[in-house]
Amino acid sequence: MTNIRKSHPLAKMINKSFIDLPAPSNISAWWNFGSLLGVCLILQILTGLFLAMHYTADTTTAFSSVTHICRDVNYGWIIRYMHANGASMFFICLFMHVGRGMYYGSYTFSETWNIGILLLFTVMATAFMGYVLPWGQMSFWGATVITNLLSAIPYIGTNLVEWIWGGFSVDKATLTRFFAFHFILPFIISALAAVHLLFLHETGSNNPSGVVSDSDKIPFHPYYTIKDILGLLLLILTLMLLVLFSPDLLGDPDNYTPANPLNTPPHIKPEWYFLFAYAILRSIPNKLGGVLALILSILILAIIPLLHTSKQRSMMFRPLSQCLFWLLVADLLTLTWIGGQPVEHPFITIGQLASIFYFSILLILMPIFSTIENHLLKW
């Protein structure tokens, strides 16, 4: 009798994707983040679903409904904080996942990489709209400032902003549509993630050395399922430590004040995971220029495969490129810090220098250093 997992159509599909999948024998813990992102997505959908049962998308009751969830709903506080901090864990895993793709040259799988960039944009849009829903001061002003950036688009900008707002300012219509989009987008993300996996399984996984591993494959189960479970336990441990000991560590105190259109907070800033892009936006004095730089800071990932000049795929044996990569990481941390600081003397200059450095590393220095390495290795 044939094993059911190899004969049943549905089980066969799962088997080919997660059980008998041939995987390189040398992939490291950096390859755990894909499965962790899947877990984060499931966790966010489930906690979000339970929050949506009690939340009301109306400007007069949104803030109160979140308070009600935390105070009166059974275990509402833990669901709310798991959802809020789960978003932070999601972005930590996302940044690690993208960083791993850049370091080990996984971007040469162009279809998988491009779907990944689309996923990144969709997750960022979802997180932004989710931040608006509690209707605190930072929710309201964050929504006003970020949506207002679209007015920089020539000719259609103002009409576009008013169309998104559903009126002449961020109000009830805006909140209702943001809730609708925030609810539907995770399911679109799930579909895109399935396509991401589909393209990945067409080529097979990359590995740290960057060489073809067809001659040395091992089954995904039990080797990598066990490895992924360890990563999962560490993720849940970190998340629960955050939720149970300092749930507001990554939030903004201003968001505990109900939204007031008549009172602007002294310093408007988004969640920590958008601060690097926000710092790039603020470093350019021109509005349209800032918006373009903001979009390009993420969209630049799409041209990384075109700028790959090295004869080697991975950075594993390329010390110059490694130094440059870690400088890029340090630069992104600097931008994140600057994004959270007020717009005044030393921070403006640091932000501008860090922004120039960010684009210079990716567009100019990486290709040059890769070419130098080719000559040093006589390739």
From Swiss-Prot:
Lineage of source species: Eukaryota, Metazoa, Chordata, Craniata, Vertebrata
Any Pfam family hit: Cytochrome_B
Keyword Lipoprotein part of the UniProt annotation: no
An example molecular function term from Gene Ontology annotations: metal ion binding
Protein name per the record: Cytochrome b
Positions that bind heme b b566: H97, H196
Positions annotated to bind a ubiquinone: H201
Role according to the record: Component of the ubiquinol-cytochrome c reductase complex (complex III or cytochrome b-c1 complex) that is part of the mitochondrial respiratory chain. The b-c1 complex mediates electron transfer from ubiquinol to cytochrome c. Contributes to the generation of a proton gradient across the mitochondrial membrane that is then used for ATP synthesis.
GO cellular component term of the entry, any: mitochondrial inner membrane
